[in-house]
């Protein structure tokens, strides 16, 4: 599994000629890293003198980030698995009309999954950005740069994931499905833009 590789192994595999891991898996990885950074800043605030008033809030942030981290770590492989299913469908036989129809059904199902996985990553990345805004507002200022790093990592993950959603929607014939996911992707992109601006304004010069 990709998530079980060392950092060096993952980077080497990404740099190779293999199609996976690609941008989608890397978006999930960046979102997982953003969750870890966000949780770290919350932990550096919890129980510290002078932050008693926000202790409960920071514990809630830490718990939410801790819950998202393993999900996003699993998405590293889910994204690559979804792409593998697209490739598998492309390789299906198409000599007869029946084979062509079966191949088309398999491709449509694979493309839908390949759009749904990054959409989930984008949702979680935007959620992490909201947590990041909270820690930049209330958290330990000595770790503000770490909090900002988390927000920016989540921002990159959200944008990359949204792009991947849109790319896969271009191959899907179900207009109702594509319209729904496109609206959701647009909403998440706008929300990420807003949260980035709000979060970074909280950084002290």
Show the residue positions of the predicted features.
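Polytopic transmembrane helical bundles with strong interfacial aromatic enrichment
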Residues: 2-5, 120, 127, 131, ...
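Short, hydrophobic/aliphatic alpha-helical segments
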Residues: 2-21
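Conserved phosphate/anionic-ligand binding catalytic regions in large, soluble enzymes, centered on
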Residues: 16-37, 142-160
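Amphipathic alpha-helix face/heptad-repeat signature
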Residues: 29-33, 61, 68-75, 114-124, ...
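A conserved active-site cap/scaffold subdomain adjacent to cofactor or substrate pockets
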Residues: 37-44
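A structural-propensity feature for long, helix-poor, extended segments
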Residues: 49-88, 188, 195
